[in-house]
């Protein structure tokens, strides 16, 4: 059964997972949420012995039902590969009596690598499924970690381009260096005069100018 997505502001209109990924936000400005929450078809005992990639597939196949097994596994394996400094991807480490899930093993050492590594591959696959032939251009504003993680995730992914806007003097020197030294034929970084709110408002204005 195909799991559909609705807006948090309107339950009448539904879209597929790939359509939601391409749109980002619903037409009414709401967020896309699944019309129902599916149940996993694997047990906790089975999950604990799975690799990160296997776990990702077990979860994602329940939510992205218009993707084939081959498509989903390609996205997952393209995202969670040697860009991470451990094959485990997100190790669960015991320190004393506490367990910690380490989310800093990605390309930029930020937890946002977990999502932004797979997003470009999901978007490209979604575009192909919906007969979108143009390049996907990502415009985003950042005040720190997101910019570098997004640049690293989309760098040299065919069919995509990314432009990151940040406030000059509004990010740390290290964060600025991380962004402006990012390699990739499809990446651009723009410093603006103003603060993060100005950068974010500018990006929103571009999207609203139809």
Regions found by a protein language model. Give the residues of each.
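PLP-dependent amino-acid enzyme catalytic core
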Residues: 1-210
């Amino acid at each position: 059964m195909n799991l559909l997505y609705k807006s948090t502001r309107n339950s009448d209109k539904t879209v597929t997972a790939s359509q939601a990924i391409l749109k980002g936000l619903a037409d009414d400005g709401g967020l896309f949420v699944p019309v129902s929450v599916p149940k996993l078809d694997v047990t906790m005992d089975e999950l604990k012995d799975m690799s990160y990639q296997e776990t990702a597939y077990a979860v994602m196949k329940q939510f992205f039902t218009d993707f084939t097994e081959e498509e989903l596994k390609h996205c997952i394996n393209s995202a969670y590969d040697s860009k991470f400094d451990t094959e485990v991807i997100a190790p669960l480490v015991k320190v004393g009596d506490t367990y910690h899930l380490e989310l800093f093993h990605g390309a930029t050492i930020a937890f946002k690598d977990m999502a932004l590594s797979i997003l470009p591959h999901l978007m490209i696959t979604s575009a192909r499924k919906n007969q979108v032939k143009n390049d996907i251009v990502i415009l985003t504003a950042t005040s720190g970690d997101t910019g570098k993680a997004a640049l690293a995730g989309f760098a040299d992914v065919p069919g995509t381009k990314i432009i990151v806007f940040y406030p000059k003097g509004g990010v740390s020197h290290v964060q600025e260096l991380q962004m402006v030294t990012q390699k990739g034929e499809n990446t651009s970084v723009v410093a603006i005069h103003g603060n993060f709110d100005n950068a974010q408002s500018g990006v929103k204005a571009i999207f609203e100018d139809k």
